[in-house]
Amino acid sequence: VCTYLRSNVALMKKMIEEGYQDPETLQGRIDAVNEWLKDPKLLEADANAEYAAVIEIDLSEITEPILACPNDPDDVKLLSDIQGTPIQDIFLGSCMTNIGHFRAAAEIWRGEKFNPNVRTWVCPPTRMDQDKLKEEAVFSVFSAMGARLEIAGCSLCMGNQARVPDGVNMFSTSTRNFDDRIGNGAQVYLGSAELGAVTSTMGKLPTPAEYLAVYKEKVAPKKDEI
């Protein structure tokens, strides 16, 4: 939470620097967030709170990626259940991504060959992230992979700037995969940026072993930098 809030503070400061029309309001938010960050406390339920249900998940038992399947965000399956599914389009973007996701994808793609059978779309959520990625030369990796570089914003997540061809299988890092949202008849799988990057190079959903091998080799050693 603190990491995201610090990122938001940086964004608001940049907006003020670029001439935002109501700087006092933004500065007030900046001050309030910074004050909370000095002693961060999350909301807690009352001791006598009653719950409709309690769900406990042992994260140590989750040993592979979980994806939302076409075309329902609630229809989730393990990667091993759908491995090998051919994918024609990859979308790395939406407001659920942050700059670290793009850095991780670039590490996975670095040194890989362009896959002509996959259309890869890259769209940072904010111009601040977009500019930073350009400064870090991350965009050059995307270009080498033949990615379509979208203007920062929604892009394919809403299907309002562009759409994929009819009936394709697609992997997206967005949060919604409702029927025809991104393309007519498109079958959309939702998952992480790292898994999307591996899928882009292979043209299909990898096996858990294939994915983890790439992640451990290319991403894990640089997790502190990413």
Predicted feature residues:
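Fe-S-dependent hydro-lyases/dehydratases of central metabolism
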Residues: 1-226
